[in-house]
């Protein structure tokens, strides 16, 4: 089978072996964000700090300069601002003493365009040449499941972009109907539209607010509403474009619902182990394949949402879900 190698480890020693096979020497001398979710208050199923420390140690041994990283959330609560999330991380055991590196919570971003959608990637991720994405695999009521793609697609961007991914919509223009009246240009608060040289949109500026569609009186403007799965894939790709990434998925405490839910429901699949790979689509596909062996279609049955849809969209954007599984 073509594609990348995904290493399967049953315990912490196996994770260490998988990381040693992942050519971390290329991280030498570089700042290496380790992107993870450090837990919602009330949810007991977040990544273990001990697992984070294993990755921190491996990156340090390779000459890299790691730091744990996540972004503030868009919904109300303690994790909606940096100081609150820092307190949550501390209570959950993510401290410099316990994990061996700094813990950084991001609030700001850098605007990029991916698949004609403008998003704000967290500044710390945008500035990094490389990163490790450490993800807890679990169900998700809207996306079917959460793994590496979900971790990046929602957790790697700013509050505004989180909201946009959840309610992804892109204005579409019909030149055959348009009269170049300029009402859409006047209505746009982001100054993303112009008609001086024909109708044009600057996707880097567009916020997807819909005011241009509302202002149009000819029907030349409409919304193309995307699924959350595609929005997550686009956002994840924006976070990793031109970057060197190692992915670690934890298939432990596989809960019914997301890490952001203070009441995540029950465990829906026995613990399986850990996966380490170099492609988000491949490691998520391998995660679902292993879970399906233990609990066939458990996420689809629980949520009614196909968990593989986000992987298919990721492949369309350039990721590769083909993999060879290698146990270590």
Question: Where are the regions a protein language model picked out?
Answer:
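N-terminal and secondary-structure boundary signal
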Residues: 1-328
């Amino acid at each position: 089978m073509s594609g990348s190698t995904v290493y399967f480890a049953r315990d912490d020693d196996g994770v260490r072996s998988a990381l040693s096979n992942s050519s971390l020497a290329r991280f030498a001398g570089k700042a290496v964000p380790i992107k993870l979710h450090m837990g919602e208050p009330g949810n007991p199923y977040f990544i273990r700090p001990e697992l984070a420390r294993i990755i921190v140690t491996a990156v340090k041994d390779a000459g890299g300069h790691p730091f744990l990283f996540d972004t503030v959330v868009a919904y109300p609560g303690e994790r909606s601002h940096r100081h609150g999330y820092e307190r949550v991380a501390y209570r959950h055991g993510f401290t410099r003493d316990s994990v061996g590196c700094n813990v950084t919570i991001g609030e700001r971003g850098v605007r990029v365009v991916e698949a004609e959608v403008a998003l704000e990637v967290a500044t710390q991720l945008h500035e990094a040449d490389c990163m490790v994405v450490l993800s807890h695999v679990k169900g998700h009521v809207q996306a079917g499941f959460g793994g590496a793609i979900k971790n990046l697609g929602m957790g790697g961007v700013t509050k505004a972009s989180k909201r946009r991914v959840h309610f992804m919509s892109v204005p579409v223009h019909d030149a055959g109907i348009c009269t170049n009246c300029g009402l859409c240009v006047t209505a746009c608060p982001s100054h993303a539209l112009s008609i001086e040289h024909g109708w044009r949109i600057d996707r880097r500026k567009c916020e997807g607010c819909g005011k241009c569609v509302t202002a149009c009186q000819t029907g030349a403007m409409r919304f193309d509403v995307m699924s959350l799965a595609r929005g997550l894939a686009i956002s994840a790709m924006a976070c990793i474009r031109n970057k060197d990434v190692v992915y670690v998925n934890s298939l432990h405490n596989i809960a019914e619902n997301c890490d952001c839910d203070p009441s995540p429901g029950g465990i829906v699949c026995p613990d399986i182990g850990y996966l380490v790979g170099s492609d988000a689509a491949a490691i998520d596909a391998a995660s679902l394949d292993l879970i399906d062996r233990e609990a066939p279609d458990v996420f689809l049955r629980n949520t009614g949402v196909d968990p593989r849809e986000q992987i298919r969209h990721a492949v369309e954007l350039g990721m590769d879900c083909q993999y060879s599984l290698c146990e270590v």
